[in-house]
Amino acid sequence: MIDQIIDEVTDSDPYQELLVTADGVAEGTLGVRLDKWLAEQLPELSRSRCQKLIESGQVQRNGLVCQDKNLILKTGDRLVVNIPELIPLDVVAQNIPLDILYEDEQLIIINKPAGLVVHPGPGHPDGTVVNALLAHCPDLAGIGGVQRPGIVHRLDKDTTGAMVVAKTELALHNLQVQLKEKTARRLYWGIVYGSPKEIQGTVNLPVGRHPGDRQKMGIVPVEKGGREAVTHWRLLERIGNHSWLEFQLETGRTHQIRVHSKQMGHPLVGDNLYTSPGSVNVNLPGQALHAHQLSLIHPVSGEIITAIAPMPAHFEKLLVYLRQRIP
């Protein structure tokens, strides 16, 4: 069992001193990485924040600055961690309406509309979910210490539905772990071209940046930079030459459902990036993909929180139109 000693000179002192000790562990290596140990001992900080502190020279080991996050700690190591105040983000708060599905002091779950980018970036300096959240939750500016405060996972610009955002460092770290350990449950609805032969299945193929088009993702071998990607799917309804599917994400790679559905031979309707444009006589904002349910464990209470995002109007209109076309 690893214990810790934390000495704080004053409540406002940014330095924390930690002594690595162990009960029943012989003198020598503990086999624990520095960044992992810090994140465990300082649960109010996310692991990425701990890594940034290490890389920026804010951690000393036995009196010497240590910038190696992979360092293996040993019994008796004394760590001094400087946790400076976070620099305010250069992102303006904007009064953009939010459809809130759930909110408390730890987290907020919103129903993201189509056309809204999650965070500022090239081509989208403002008018994003982050800008809206900063107006709704001013304290969010310091969470994570990056340009994406509190963002646990993302939805593509034209994907609608449930998305959780952390309001504290503790919640950010906890929710990131839930996604990594697959204890959070994310269900999506999608309308695709064609009709799969089976009624359910799993696509387990690595996803990475498309070698010929940097705007796209594709099936890329792990040895060439692809990352594990697993998508479970089941058929909800066959509608003529189209199908309504439910997808469950086991991993959360960029464009994962869009890439995997195309690989199945059933690309999403309206996804002009991954398939040739097709006319369905319904004004779609983009791909017909909706994150309709998000379930997670509350970071503090331990209760199961389930948020349901209602079907958006354009999605419902598409279903009605396709059903009417059936002879």
UniProtKB/Swiss-Prot annotation:
One of its GO terms (biological process) is enzyme-directed rRNA pseudouridine synthesis. The lineage of its organism: Bacteria, Bacillati, Cyanobacteriota, Cyanophyceae, Synechococcales. NCBIfam families: rluA_subfam (TIGR00005). The keyword Protein biosynthesis does not apply. It catalyses: a uridine in RNA = a pseudouridine in RNA. PANTHER family: MITOCHONDRIAL RNA PSEUDOURIDINE SYNTHASE, RIBOSOMAL LARGE SUBUNIT PSEUDOURIDINE SYNTHASE D. Residues 32-105 form the S4 RNA-binding domain. Keywords: Isomerase, RNA-binding. This is Uncharacterized RNA pseudouridine synthase slr1629. InterPro entries: PsdUridine_synth_cat_dom_sf, PsdUridine_synth_RluA-like_CS, PsdUridine_synth_RluC/D, PsdUridine_synth_RsuA/RluA, RluA_PseudoU_synthase, S4_RNA-bd, S4_RNA-bd_sf. Disulfide bonds: none annotated. Its EC number is 5.4.99.-.
